[in-house]
Amino acid sequence: MIQRLLPEAMVNTYDVHHFNMKSLEACLKWCDVVAIGPGIGTGVIQKNMIEKVLEYNLPTVIDADGINNISEDERLKKKLHKNVVITPHLGEMSRFLNTPVEEIASNLIKYGREVNYKYNINCILKDARTVITTEQETFINLSGNSGMATAGSGDVLTGIVAALIGIGVEFNNATVLAPYIHGLAGDKAMEYVSKTSMMATDIIEGIKILFKGMR
């Protein structure tokens, strides 16, 4: 997606064919949390970007092509650290663990815990009922609805995790709380759109309504 008007965002662009790593490093030196993956594509430059992010040991949320790039590179898997949370759907989890989707779908908790055990990272495994695993605990999220199975919904979840960490919520707590907020926001969106017409932007609007009601 080409950048559109978003006045509240500070943007630093890059040329995928002539990427300047120093530009990324400059951002990593001041940021509190990193969300990487949605829309970046796969390839050597993207893998180098992910490697550089992991070197800074920052709280990091990895989704979509971030997970796909790591799945292709055992070297990157070895650089994962305890401040990382991945947010895969079943297909991404299948590639990450090199395990059939059907096997993962029938053993969500088992494979969520396997990610934590093997790589010492948190995992939000997205399905009809999302399974969240941290170092010591496992949670099943019950909020949300089938209308949220729409393009960009997972990207919204990635943003919620990163936003919670950015405002000071402890890393494990943010991992657990974000899917619940995401689901509740989707349920709020159901008050003014149907399941069949729900878009990711509706979920974002649901977040605004949800937080206003909490004040």
What do the PLM-derived regions correspond to, one by one?
Residues 1-143, 215:
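Glycine-rich phosphate/dinucleotide-binding loop and adjoining beta-alpha-beta core of small-molecule
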Residues 5, 186-215:
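Charged C-terminal helix
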Residues 39-43, 146, 154-157, 161, ...:
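Gly/Ser/Thr-rich beta-alpha loop segments that engage phosphate groups in nucleotides
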Residues 52, 169, 193:
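N-terminal loops that bind phosphate or other acidic moieties
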Residues 95-96, 150-181:
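Short, small-residue alpha-helix embedded
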Residues 108-117, 171-186, 200-208:
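Short, well-structured alpha-helical segments that form the helix of a local strand-helix-strand
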Residues 140-152:
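Short pre-catalytic strand/loop immediately N-terminal to key active-site residues, enriched for Gly-Thr
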